[in-house]
Amino acid sequence: MENISNKSLPAIITDVADRYWQRLNEAWPELSTLIDKKHCDELYRIMGVSDFIAEQLCRHPDWIPALFDGQLVKVERLSFDRELHELMEPCRSEDEAKAILRCYRNRLMVRLAWRDFFGYVSLEDSLLDLSALSEALIIAGRDWLYRELCQQYGTPCDREGNPQPLMVIGMGKLGGRELNFSSDIDLIFTFPEHGETQGGRRALDNQQFFIKMGQRLVNLLHQVTVDGFVYRVDMRLRPYGESGPLVVSFSALEDYYQEQGRDWERYAMVKARALGPWTAFSDELHSMLRPFVYRRYIDFSAIESLRKMKQLITQEVRRRKLTDNIKLGAGGIREVEFVVQSFQLIRGGREPSLRQQSLFAAIDTLYTLGQLEYLAVDDLKQSYLLLRRVENLLQAIGDRQTQTLPDNGLDWYRLCHCMGMASEAELRTHIESAMSKIHRHFNDTVGGNEQDESSQLWTQQLWSVQEDEHAQALISEQSIEDPDLWPMLKSWRDTIAKRSIGPRGRDTLDKLMPWLLRELTPLVSPSKAFEPVSKVLDQILTRTTYLELLYENPGARQQLVSLCCASPWISAQLAKFPMLLDELIDPAQLYDTTSLDDYGSELRQYLLRVPEEDMEQQMEGLRQFKLSQQLKIAAADVTGVLPVSQVSNHLTLLAEAIIEQVVMQAWLQVSSRHGVPTHLDEGDMGFAVIGYGKAGGIELGYGSDLDLVFLHSYSRERFPENTETNGERPIEVGHFYLKLAQRILHLFSTRTNSGELYEVDMRLRPSGASGLLVSEIEHFGQYQREEAWTWEHQALVRARFMFGDNALSSRFSTLRSEVLQLHREKETLAQEVREMRLKMREHLLKVSPDMFDLKQSAGGIADIEFIAQYLVLANANEHSELSIWSDNIRIFSTLGELALLPQLDAQELIQAYLFLRDENHRLTLQQKPGQLALELVELHAQRVIEIYQNVLEF
């Protein structure tokens, strides 16, 4: 390919170059006298194609003479470490260290980008240099911080007194020495042995030492200052993701991967590499990780894992509307990586030569071993090189992490100019050809799912027929007795004919509909089934990718029809949020609900696909995860795969996982501006979320809101010296927790493309809507003991700790038990509970005499809940075990065991409660109000009324 030095610049680029040239001459008037015309011409050209280089040189014109004195052609990557060591050695403050690292990074990046634009070096050499620079900067920062912290806390040592280092594992392209120009860096921090520091004022546990060091290292590299940043650092690939410790020991790392390591983590670990000078610890670390990554047998399960991972990426591309993405799209950079890594995982256990981080080296080894043909290797390498060069140049234009082709004319001109292409169309042709080759080899490796388009279906004729008689004859020939089918189909077809869906969309719809009709016509009432399906189609007519999804995936079509027939609620969800159609592709996965213990880890893994700093996409990711998991629960519910008794457990544990991530995101956002309260121990937040009502009772339904109360641990009396946060904009600690609570509510309530996360009701907090949004925990306890009404103690029966520090969990449990165990006069209590129940019924019960409101009618859910709450408040003073549970089922079981309620009554209340809740779930999925004909519930309701009267009306 040509380079830019041999071509005249398009006018759109010279306009940019002129502006920068003027700025540079103003900053450095003697420019033209110090460099010759040839170099001036080259400088002018580079300023036209790269905003990053132009901005840096306008700020640092003194770099220019050295660039033309041999620095452009020759970059000695082996000298990076030495140069940085010399620069960092005299450094005495963190601010100074940040400035040194950023200045060095920017100066070297200018050199490396300049070489790329002019084609002075091969792409392979450029990637090696970018990776070496990144590694040198990380290690320089690490080593400087290690010296600083050792002076402050002493040297971390094992139990024999041997010094322990912080090991940094480079993941992804950094590990493979193939880093992009403006990539973020995925790191994992670890250390060899537990122990404590020696030589400091007081001994500090090694893990605490390295966590402090890790936090400061991330900040040293990641923080944006006046000089920019060194690298965007992503630590989410560490064990347990964001909820795990920032740094763990070798043994903890090994235990995690042996016991909990997932398939995607195996793929990630293929490129894992200990950064910095190679030591015995590096050997130990790689030897320890190898059995997890490379199995001793030939491991074909890797292919299935790859399919699932690719499916997730494809879904993400659709959901985020990532068009023109040369990394994640079909045939993109990621597919080359998947092809090579799948072979490495399958055969790496038997073939040590495949255990390498570099894609270039691994693909050559695959050819040597006969695993890939020469033509496949050549196609993959040349196509990969083209896409990586495009990616590198795109990022070097503005030092932005992007893999998306330009959306503006200027950057297209720049890219075409640097690639030696005459036009956008010519470059697109080359890119599309490369991606087509990659995708073909990817499908050869993992298996494709193309559909036979030649199948001739009678439904094809039905979809295209114009005459009513012909259509009715076709339907009659199939013995379908549904007079509404053709009128409904024709009406819908005529309606969508008026809509503008584009030629590609129209063509895909015409291919899809015969197959979809083949799913519908065998049903008892095809027209009835078509109605909800058509509403889903209405929403995706202009989103061709979803039409293509249904066309290309028979399983997705089958599930669409099946679920729309089974539940109007599900069909409404699919119509409102078409991205859920992705979940229908794999029926086995759709009906395999996440285990109750795994919602947290699944959500953390899901959010790994979203840039940590992209708050909008993080919010969208939370909502999409909730929607997809709710769909799986509902699908398993309506088909009987999931027992109805388990539905609320799943919906509640899903909410808990989301609450955890919302609080953590809110914490990051608030603390990034204001720092954190200084009274906290390392890793603590001093904050808790308490669930009330259905959330507290583990009884959430589809569409339930969350009744929450927020607590914190700070008080001026206990921490008089820690009144403010420690950030650049410190604020009073109470104000910090108020901002945190407000941010949490914002994250829950903001309506994105995927809707609202949850509606949150905070009215059960102390003093209700007029009270503080977040309460100090001891004030909360005092309020409950001295000011709370009986109905607030009833609510406390169903309160449960849902997220927060262990110390707060323990304290809340104690306070709750103390309040529930207060002595109460039973007659007075019974009267207050009855009066509250009567007020509720008068205010909320709106149903005709022949209907039964599952919640509010006499003998309904509310009566059962009030029985449980009264009996706990009346008897917990003498039976402390009654204050343990927050859910009604276990409360009634305990009451029966204690003989405070006859065993038969306890069992009948449990059965009635489960029946009413199950019916409520069923009616929600049918999008019907929570009411049944009175005769259907009369037996259950009558027994509840009798028990209610026996317990409360004495």
Swiss-Prot record:
It catalyses: [glutamine synthetase]-O(4)-(5'-adenylyl)-L-tyrosine + phosphate = [glutamine synthetase]-L-tyrosine + ADP; [glutamine synthetase]-L-tyrosine + ATP = [glutamine synthetase]-O(4)-(5'-adenylyl)-L-tyrosine + diphosphate. GO terms for biological process: regulation of glutamine family amino acid metabolic process. The keyword NADP does not apply. CDD domains: NT_GlnE_GlnD_like (cd05401). One of its GO terms (cellular component) is cytosol. Its EC number is 2.7.7.89, 2.7.7.42. It is an enzyme of class 2 (transferase). SUPFAM superfamilies: Nucleotidyltransferase, Nucleotidyltransferase substrate binding subunit/domain. It holds the Pfam family GlnE. This is Bifunctional glutamine synthetase adenylyltransferase/adenylyl-removing enzyme. It comes from Shewanella sediminis (strain HAW-EB3). The lineage of its organism: Bacteria, Pseudomonadati, Pseudomonadota, Gammaproteobacteria, Alteromonadales.
